[in-house]
């Protein structure tokens, strides 16, 4: 039996793919905050805030998204991990903590680099909270569906990145 997904427990998903390129080559792509907009059917792009012009711990950006059922929205995020050629992570601002945490991890191998993109929901408030509050009996299904959407977009991202090599 599958564990029931609860937003308060910060559910997550991730996808990985081995790409035949070095971490250095891939890092040049992954450190561009707009790269996923080329492949995602939801994320449309981002702009740096507060004078930032490149990723670094503490740098902030505003991302724009579009979803056929949710509509259009923007959110502000902060880079929380920046380890060149290894790991980049950002948290989406939410009430009471991050609404979500996103990132990429790279691990060099003899076949290239394993690139993992991941997303953790919560624990701060996000658009999912209203849906869950309206249908608390469907919390597991709402979260499972959203994680499936995120995983599908992450698969598209990694496939797109691989196509650039």
Model-identified regions with their sequence ranges:
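Well-ordered beta-strand positions in beta-sheet-rich domains
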Residues: 14-18, 74-76, 101-103, 116-118
């Amino acid at each position: 039996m599958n564990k029931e997904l609860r937003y308060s427990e910060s559910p997550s998903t991730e996808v990985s793919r081995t790409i035949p390129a070095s971490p250095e080559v891939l890092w040049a792509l992954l450190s561009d905050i707009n790269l996923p907009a080329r492949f995602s059917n939801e994320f449309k792009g981002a702009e740096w805030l507060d004078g930032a012009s490149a990723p670094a711990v503490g740098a902030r950006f505003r991302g724009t998204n579009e979803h056929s059922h949710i509509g259009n929205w923007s959110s502000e995020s902060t880079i929380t991990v920046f380890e060149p050629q290894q790991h980049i992570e950002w948290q989406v601002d939410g009430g009471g903590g991050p609404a979500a945490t996103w990132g990429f991890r790279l691990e060099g191998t003899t076949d290239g680099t394993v690139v993992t993109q991941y997303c953790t929901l919560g624990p701060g408030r996000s658009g999912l909270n209203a849906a869950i509050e309206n249908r608390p009996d469907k919390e597991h299904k709402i979260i499972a569906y959203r994680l499936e959407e995120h995983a599908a977009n992450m698969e598209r991202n990694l496939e797109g990145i691989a196509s650039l090599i």
